[in-house]
Curated annotation (Swiss-Prot):
UniProt keyword terms in alphabetical order: ATP-binding, Cytoplasm, Ligase, Nucleotide-binding, tRNA processing
Role played: Ligates lysine onto the cytidine present at position 34 of the AUA codon-specific tRNA(Ile) that contains the anticodon CAU, in an ATP-dependent manner. Cytidine is converted to lysidine, thus changing the amino acid specificity of the tRNA from methionine to isoleucine.
Enzyme category, top tier: ligase
One GO term of the biological process aspect: tRNA modification
Reaction(s) the record says it catalyses: cytidine(34) in tRNA(Ile2) + L-lysine + ATP = lysidine(34) in tRNA(Ile2) + AMP + diphosphate + H(+)
Disulfide bonds listed in the record: none
Gene3D superfamilies for the chain: HUPs
Phylogenetic lineage: Bacteria, Pseudomonadati, Bacteroidota, Bacteroidia, Bacteroidales
Family: Belongs to the tRNA(Ile)-lysidine synthase family.
One Pfam family matching this protein: ATP_bind_3
Protein name per its UniProtKB record: tRNA(Ile)-lysidine synthase
Organism: Porphyromonas gingivalis (strain ATCC 33277 / DSM 20709 / CIP 103683 / JCM 12257 / NCTC 11834 / 2561)
Sites where the protein binds ATP: S31, G32, G33, A34, D35, S36
Length: 454
């Protein structure tokens, strides 16, 4: 017997303990699309008192305003209190050199948090469903992820975000709306495959379903299996986390006695801002003499005689300042008088001479730069920086790269790095990271050509 959407959501709320017992007031993120409209209606059916929150990101011209008008009308008809806000999403993304998708996400969740406190509402219900979660699992797999990433979206977050539709499929949601004769808005940008999620939805998922027509069920089983693994792993590492929180250090001997020191240390140190390459170097240091230090943006890790100690950075130990890039500009003046400049255009528009060895020039796809989820910026080197040098095999620290190239210490200290978050993209004037290299140019695609002279 096919379960109704309302009963499915009721079961999810009960089994996943989404709401504290006795709490019937919920803030619903209401875009006007099928998923959020169904979520609002189902929660009302289940007896929850709902308040709606609508974001107008002004990304689709008149369509965005029509969405807002639809939401206002729906809430008026249902007698649901509505709070709405307008965002200049494009400007926000440009100022922070992040993708439109990431900008909208940051703006949305920041406002939800503020509104939740203002209205004294404990939970914010968002309308992600099972198909969204399957797409997230595939996206995370393509990016490279761990157990939690392969589990997809959590049903409940610590900041009050809950996902009551996460066990329901898109087909079930649309069937419910059709049966109840409920209208909704359709977002035309959902068909735009320039956005990564849409690319996965419209191209990759159909191909995967050719391999396995029961892909949705297979991914659900995978998620359930991995949730069990994640719970088991969390329990196994609980003592290490408690010790690190209580003493700011952990025993090197105990780490080395575990079957997977890197996996353990990644789980322990990633929350402090250390990246995978740094943590690999930490693992290597376990078999070396004490004294090594590693830096994240907020913490310092010391390899002492028998312990690893994690300390917050003091003002005297600040990591190098990051100078953010605004892609809409054409240059960045650096404090030492040097300048990083860039041009935008197709290959025919750009002077690509000398690009074969990317020392003073670097070429990146414009779409890639715009889609970066972390800030692209320029800073000085810091301990633990790694690079996969273009034209070479393997990975090495930036300091080892300079030593191998016989670069004088003064020149090393004066070097500049182009970075995406914690990843080194380019030792400016020396070498690019091959992971960001372009294998084949497209005559029609736009690129950014960066130039820097030592």
């Amino acid at each position: 017997m096919k379960i109704s959407l309302t009963n499915r959501v009721r079961t999810t709320i009960r089994e996943r303990k989404l709401f504290r017992e006795g709490n019937r007031l919920v803030l619903v993120a209401l875009s006007g699309g099928a998923d959020s409209v169904a979520l609002l209606c189902v929660l009302r059916e289940l007896g929850y008192e709902t308040v709606a929150a609508h974001c107008n990101f002004h990304l689709r011209g008149v369509e965005s305003d029509e969405d807002a008008a639809f939401v206002e009308g729906l809430c008026r008809d249902l007698d649901v209190p509505l709070h709405r806000i307008d965002f200049d999403t494009v400007r926000y993304a440009r100022e922070r050199s992040i993708s439109i998708e990431m900008a909208a996400r940051e703006l949305r969740y920041e406002w939800f948090g503020l509104l939740r406190k203002e209205l004294a509402i404990e939970y914010v219900a968002v309308a992600h469903h099972a198909d969204d979660n399957a797409e997230t699992m595939v996206l995370n797999l393509c990016r490279g992820t761990g157990i939690s990433g392969l589990c997809g979206m959590p049903y409940k977050r610590n900041d009050g975000i809950v996902r009551p539709l996460l066990d329901a499929t898109r087909d079930e949601i649309e069937a419910y709306l059709l049966d109840q004769k409920i209208t909704y808005r359709t977002d035309s940008s959902n068909e735009d495959t320039r956005f990564r999620r849409n690319l996965v939805r419209h191209r990759i998922m159909p191909l995967l379903k050719e391999l396995n027509p029961s892909l949705q069920e297979a991914l659900l089983r995978t998620r359930e299996n991995l949730e069990g693994v994640a719970a088991f792993f969390s329990k196994a590492t609980e003592d290490f986390h408690n010790t690190l929180r209580a003493t700011a250090s952990i025993s090197i001997r105990e780490v080395k006695e575990t079957p997977a020191p890197f996996t353990l240390l990644y789980d322990l140190l990633h929350p402090y801002g250390f990246n995978r390459d740094q943590i690999r170097e930490v693992v290597t240091s376990l078999d070396n003499p004490p004294g090594a230090s590693f830096f994240s943006s907020s913490h310092r890790l010391l390899r002492e005689r028998d312990r690893l100690t994690v300390l917050p950075l003091s003002p005297k130990m600040e990591v190098p300042e990051l100078f953010g890039l605004k892609i809409g500009d054409s240059f960045l003046d650096l404090p030492d008088g040097k300048q990083l400049s860039w041009q935008r255009g197709t290959p025919a528009d750009l002077d690509l001479e000398g690009l074969r060895l990317p020392n003073t020039k670097l070429l990146l796809p414009l779409a890639f730069v715009e889609s970066l989820q972390e800030e692209l910026g320029v800073r000085r080197p810091q301990r633990g920086d790694h690079i996969h040098p273009y034209g070479m095999k393997g990975c090495k620290t930036v300091s080892r790269f300079f030593i191998d190239r016989h670069v004088p210490r003064r020149r090393r200290e004066e070097a500049w790095l182009l970075c995406q978050g914690t990843e080194v993209v380019w030792i400016m004037g020396y070498a690019a990271d091959r992971r960001f290299a372009i294998d084949e140019l497209s005559d029609t695609e736009e690129y950014l050509l960066f130039s820097f002279e030592l």
